[in-house]
Amino acid sequence: MDMLSAAEQRTLEQRMQKRQVKEFMGAFGGLVEHCFMSCVDDFTSKAISNRESGCINRCVQKWMASQQRISDRFQEHNAQLTAQMNK
């Protein structure tokens, strides 16, 4: 990134930010769809039942925990790669 001009760096950073937003929105949309399809099955009322609400909360918590675990493993892997490259 040091070889890029200031304008090129800004362009690259903007593209990276747009990509991150797009990836986040895709993941969020997938989460919403998965939890909705798994938990909401009664369409006779506008309100979400207590059972559905609890299911959605558990679904989101599991997803957040899995994303944290993936992030932790990714950071560990990157640290190992960095250590190997610095040898």
Swiss-Prot record:
It holds the Pfam family zf-Tim10_DDP. It is a peripheral membrane protein. Disulfide bonds join 35-59, 39-55. It comes from the Eukaryota. GO terms for cellular component: mitochondrial inner membrane. InterPro entries: Mito_inner_translocase_sub, Tim10-like, Tim10-like_dom_sf. Keywords: Chaperone, Disulfide bond, Membrane, Metal-binding, Mitochondrion, Mitochondrion inner membrane, Protein transport, Translocation, Transport, Zinc. A motif (Twin CX3C motif) lies at residues 35-59. The twin CX3C motif contains 4 conserved Cys residues that form 2 disulfide bonds in the mitochondrial intermembrane space. However, during the transit of TIM9 from cytoplasm into mitochondrion, the Cys residues probably coordinate zinc, thereby preventing folding and allowing its transfer across mitochondrial outer membrane. This is Mitochondrial import inner membrane translocase subunit TIM9. It comes from Gibberella zeae (strain ATCC MYA-4620 / CBS 123657 / FGSC 9075 / NRRL 31084 / PH-1).
